[in-house]
Amino acid sequence: MTQVSKTIAKPSGNANLYSRLFSYYRVYKKLIFIALAGLCLFSFVDAGMIYFVKPLIDQGLSKADSHTLQLGALLVVAIFFLRGIASFTSSYAIAYISSKVTYRIRQQAFDKLLYLPRTYFDLNSRGSLISKIIYDTEQLSQSFSSAVVIAIRESVIILVLFSMMVYNSWQLTAIFLVIVPIIALIINKVSKRFKNISHKLQNSMGQVSNKTEQAILNQQEIVLLDTRTQISAQFEKTNNNNRQQNMKLQATSAISNPVIQLIASFAIAAVLLLASIDQVLNQLTPGSFTLILIAMGSLLKPLKQLSNINQQLQKGLIAAKSLFSFLDQQEEHDIGTKQLSKTCSNIRFNNFSFTYQGKTQPALSNFSLQIKGGTSVAFVGESGSGKSTLARLLLRLYQSPKQSILINDIAIEDYSLSSLRAQFAFVSQDIVLIDDTLANNISFGCNRDVTDSEIEQAAINANVMAFAKELPLGLNSEIGENGRNLSGGQRQRIAIARAMLRDASIIVLDEATSALDNHSEKHIQQALTRLTQHKTVLIIAHKLSSIQHVDEIIVINKGRLIEQGNHKTLQAKAGYYQSLYQSQ
């Protein structure tokens, strides 16, 4: 992962937000210069065209000068040609810069997502995270790019128009200056409202994404439970909230523009009245008076555009705060330097307790256990007893107290994360499959380069070939998104083949066969037998009939180890384990 975000100062205010955002644009200095030059040229030409009204009226029409009109005809074509080149150059350069910045920030956000600790995902909805990467990145770049374009283009137009007005009549121009402080006051008031609404709009967009994602993920359950009406009503409420926030934003924008234009119209009316005074009227030619009126009317559009900058900036600032706060999140704690060797690892849990963040009830309490390398150990207990927590802590998905878990007499936090996890192969009910071939799914996540023959051998050992040979392209057949074309048992066998190829020293089986039929389970058990030979095996099981062969069974209840022994020993005790066994 490229840690670009770590080198940029954390934002503590709008000034720092702008500074941090500028760091993404800084690498495109030459393109920015070209874009700015194109914008300025476009604006200068666009506004400057009005100046030709004066000679065309005073010379071409009033004095019937055909040469002036002919020259004007040539200039119109030349001016629009120059205007077109400037428009294309600036638009393309700005679009290119904006797309590169969006790409870079989105990639950083996605990379950050991959390195965040598990606790972050427990406390934040998937919809809000998706919204950050898709919506916020686009909003951030587009808002600031749009604001910069408007600020430069319209400012140059205003400057050119204002200069022409002053040159032709400073008295009439002075009237227009009266409205500037009033417009500034309106913009300031509107800005505060934009900021508040933009924040609410962003949150509501995240809720829409979250509801949509949940509906897609749980589509089957929604249909089977016949809750479509209820889910639709919940989404309608969230969707309507998003619409209302958007309408508030649009209403604020819509009312600010007419107010600004109304104030400007009073200034134009005052100009017309002042121009009727003889002293002023005598100083004006028909061309200069027409030029001033056109210029004043033309000023309304850039003034209106400038008033909209706040809306763009506030959207961008809200997105920037959200994204930069996300990019500054602490990544997984990884300061270990030791390397875990590929041996039959001994594991020791040293009398520790663990509570998930945001919870008050401990998931594990005063837990102590020693597991000898090369043995198979099963953890049993009711749902929520703490079985899966042990596996998560071993893999350091969550941080256990220091020195509380040791592998080969070394605390797991002293190993580097990559070295630690390389020696674990994890097989569970929830199989992660990619939209690719069977072969690529088997080799997915392997920490070394593998050959086609190794993949095929793993497929044979995991009984994948039993169904792969029936597919048109065998192991090179596509399995569809998340393996939608496969059964549960077939998906499970791919996971086992993947674990075999990984060749780790510790195997974790998290209820790997609990949801399978007898035929599928037979194939899986055969594959698991091959997978777990000469390995340290940890089994998290609900189906107690599948663990009678293990070396040791650990019985957990409410986070505490209450019984320990093999199947026969625990049966003889007639305790908690026996009651669990009989209940099945």
Curated annotation (Swiss-Prot):
<feature type="domain" description="ABC transmembrane type-1">
    <location>
        <begin position="33"/>
        <end position="315"/>
    </location>
</feature>
<keyword id="KW-0813">Transport</keyword>
<dbReference type="InterPro" id="IPR039421">
    <property type="entry name" value="Type_1_exporter"/>
</dbReference>
<keyword id="KW-0472">Membrane</keyword>
<keyword id="KW-0067">ATP-binding</keyword>
<keyword id="KW-1278">Translocase</keyword>
<keyword id="KW-0445">Lipid transport</keyword>
<dbReference type="GO" id="GO:0140359">
    <property type="term" value="F:ABC-type transporter activity"/>
</dbReference>
<comment type="subunit">
    <text>Homodimer.</text>
</comment>
<comment type="function">
    <text>Involved in lipopolysaccharide (LPS) biosynthesis. Translocates lipid A-core from the inner to the outer leaflet of the inner membrane. Transmembrane domains (TMD) form a pore in the inner membrane and the ATP-binding domain (NBD) is responsible for energy generation.</text>
</comment>
<feature type="transmembrane region" description="Helical">
    <location>
        <begin position="68"/>
        <end position="88"/>
    </location>
</feature>
<dbReference type="InterPro" id="IPR011917">
    <property type="entry name" value="ABC_transpr_lipidA"/>
</dbReference>
<dbReference type="InterPro" id="IPR017871">
    <property type="entry name" value="ABC_transporter-like_CS"/>
</dbReference>
<comment type="similarity">
    <text>Belongs to the ABC transporter superfamily. Lipid exporter (TC 3.A.1.106) family.</text>
</comment>
<dbReference type="InterPro" id="IPR036640">
    <property type="entry name" value="ABC1_TM_sf"/>
</dbReference>
<feature type="transmembrane region" description="Helical">
    <location>
        <begin position="280"/>
        <end position="300"/>
    </location>
</feature>
<feature type="transmembrane region" description="Helical">
    <location>
        <begin position="167"/>
        <end position="187"/>
    </location>
</feature>
<feature type="transmembrane region" description="Helical">
    <location>
        <begin position="254"/>
        <end position="274"/>
    </location>
</feature>
<feature type="transmembrane region" description="Helical">
    <location>
        <begin position="146"/>
        <end position="166"/>
    </location>
</feature>
<dbReference type="InterPro" id="IPR011527">
    <property type="entry name" value="ABC1_TM_dom"/>
</dbReference>
<dbReference type="InterPro" id="IPR003593">
    <property type="entry name" value="AAA+_ATPase"/>
</dbReference>
<feature type="binding site">
    <location>
        <begin position="381"/>
        <end position="388"/>
    </location>
    <ligand>
        <name>ATP</name>
    </ligand>
</feature>
<feature type="transmembrane region" description="Helical">
    <location>
        <begin position="32"/>
        <end position="52"/>
    </location>
</feature>
<dbReference type="GO" id="GO:0005886">
    <property type="term" value="C:plasma membrane"/>
</dbReference>
<dbReference type="Pfam" id="PF00664">
    <property type="entry name" value="ABC_membrane"/>
</dbReference>
<keyword id="KW-0997">Cell inner membrane</keyword>
<keyword id="KW-1133">Transmembrane helix</keyword>
<keyword id="KW-0812">Transmembrane</keyword>
<dbReference type="GO" id="GO:0016887">
    <property type="term" value="F:ATP hydrolysis activity"/>
</dbReference>
<dbReference type="InterPro" id="IPR003439">
    <property type="entry name" value="ABC_transporter-like_ATP-bd"/>
</dbReference>
<dbReference type="GO" id="GO:0034040">
    <property type="term" value="F:ATPase-coupled lipid transmembrane transporter activity"/>
</dbReference>
<keyword id="KW-1003">Cell membrane</keyword>
<protein>
    <recommendedName>
        <fullName>ATP-dependent lipid A-core flippase 2</fullName>
        <ecNumber>7.5.2.6</ecNumber>
    </recommendedName>
</protein>
<dbReference type="Pfam" id="PF00005">
    <property type="entry name" value="ABC_tran"/>
</dbReference>
<keyword id="KW-0547">Nucleotide-binding</keyword>
<dbReference type="InterPro" id="IPR027417">
    <property type="entry name" value="P-loop_NTPase"/>
</dbReference>
<dbReference type="GO" id="GO:0005524">
    <property type="term" value="F:ATP binding"/>
</dbReference>
<feature type="domain" description="ABC transporter">
    <location>
        <begin position="347"/>
        <end position="583"/>
    </location>
</feature>
